[in-house]
Amino acid sequence: MKNFTFITLGFAVSVAAVEPKFRAQEIDAKVGVGYGLQLADMDGDKKTDIILCDKDKIVWYHNPTWEKHQVSGHLTKRDHVCITARDLDGDGKAEIAVGGQWNIGESNDASKSGAVFYLNPTTDRKGNWTPVQLPHEPNTHRMHWIQSGKGKFDLVVKPLYGPKGADGRKRGAKVWAYHMPKDPTKEWSRILVSNFMKDSHNFHPIDWDRDGREEFLQAGLNGVYWFGRDKNDEWKYMQFSQNYAGEVRDGLTARGKRFFAAIEPKHGTTVAIYLQTKAQFWQRRVLDETLKDGH
């Protein structure tokens, strides 16, 4: 038994020591301004494709040939800014939503800033998909398909800034969860998730309790917050940190302790991790303070 254990551990160490090797492969040299990428199976062949949100079009590249398929031209007068892709109905093919009309200087007038679209796919997943425009807040900036139950998903959309008040200061931004009807061309219902986060650059889906309903972490001027639903499907929140943060991702240590990593502040210089504690605010550890314009 001892020899067997020794051999097993030795094998594990040798495997862990092997460094992965990668080679660069250019698949498109004609990207305008690439605002976002998603990885998902677009045509049901069980291979992960690449979906690109370019400033004036939405395209996907077919794995493994990387053949390019444009599914949308310019949806708004200004740039597209974000995209989310995920299989919502279990058919093995991802659905797409897009944010556009990127206008960082306008956070009050929704006719001049922000846009949210669901792209209704063609049968062959090629050609121009039909855009379905949804209500939106100004400054549309990030979005995710968030699982709300077994086989159910909401489109959660976050602006960068909230509206500017009479004193010239920006208020909290409204984050909405959109629910798709059976016919996506019909009216979508939506629920207000929050309205207090200021200067919020990004958010990240999680499912810490593994109940099939996802939560998310959101980074902003206020710090990093957790948002999730209770048993009555009402949105609740908890604050885990107070430092101004622009990016956030979660993980587990080798011993299984939960943590999240953040770039502080927005477009900042510092990488910090926060280890879960019994206290409200998690334990902060700085990893690096030499970043420039960290994303």
Role assignments for model-derived ranges:
Residues 8-18:
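Hydrophobic h-region of N-terminal signal peptides that target proteins for export
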Residues 17-295:
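Beta-propeller-forming repeat regions
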Residues 7-8, 207:
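Terminal non-domain segments
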Residues 1-4:
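Positively charged n-region of N-terminal signal peptides that target proteins for export
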